[in-house]
Amino acid sequence: MFDRDDLPNALRETLAKVRPLIARGARPQTSPLPLTRELTMRNPFAFAAFPSWKRLFEDTSKAAQAAVYRDPAFRKQFREDLKRPASFADWARITLHEVTSPKLKRYEGKTVAEIAAERGVDGVDALLDVTLEDDLQNEFTVQSWNTRIDRMAELLNDRSVLLGLGDGGAHLDMLCDSGYPTYVLGTWVRERKVLTLEEAVRRMTSDPADLFGIQDRGRIKPGLAADIVIFDPATVGSGGRPERLHDLPGGAKRMVMRSRGIEMTLVNGEVTWEKGALTGASAGNVLRS
């Protein structure tokens, strides 16, 4: 389940509809992280649902895409498309993450809304003008869902909701969900006090272990596997946006989420992580369904 800005009542309505399923054992699931995606204007998938952007995917050469971005008719149609409800229509949720042109470096880290205000144009012109000025090499970060603190607090406090979501690396160049446990502990527990520390730990350990029938995990108890994370409650956390690395074959990129405040990790009683580094121990087992 995701919370969308354009559908403020969707979470409550959906949870109400699925209560009979929850009573039979079903569990809704959500990510405690704001869903943040990387967007390049050479592959503008985030806008693919808009009719005006169809041309961008018919001829994907740089010259053809640049011609579309310059076209006043395209910009006019895009503005019309944006009048329909859309989860990313708020330009304050789209940030210029990286540029190649030195002249545009001053805009890195600013939202499209901020760039538009500085230039005295609307969001459409700001987005497309900066893209053309950087020869379509710039990259944006889009905060799509789960960005409203009040509605997320309500969702996270619903004990029927399973915390944690991931795509198994299917979009490793666009997003990274693996930082959600440290984000919960740092943001939702310590900073915003939406969950108690004890409840947050339970929701991320014994709760999923019980759901999936993993009987020897999820608790610190004699006779169970010693899978333990030792952390500092005062410093544990992670950011809401992943970091980009270029360490895949051919220099391809992937997204990673860095953690803070993790002192040690044990898997089956062996220390696998200590003082910010892997120890080299491989004490886990592959789970097969």
Residue ranges and their predicted role:
Residues 105-106, 209, 254-257:
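Short loop/turn motifs at secondary-structure junctions and domain boundaries
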Residues 130-131, 204, 227:
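A general structural motif at alpha-helix termini
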Residues 29, 120, 167, 200, ...:
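Divalent metal-coordination and catalytic microenvironments
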Residues 1-193:
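Active-site neighborhoods of metal-dependent hydrolases
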Residues 139-152, 197-201, 209-243:
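Acidic, glycine-enriched loop/beta-strand segments at the rims
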Residues 192-194, 202-205:
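Glycine-rich loop-to-alpha-helix module at the N-terminal edge of alpha/beta enzyme cores
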Residues 154-161, 178-180, 230-277, 281-283:
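C-terminal cap of metal-dependent C-N hydrolases
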Residues 24-28, 159, 218, 226-229, ...:
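Structural beta-strand/beta-sheet cores of well-ordered domains, especially the beta-sheet scaffolds
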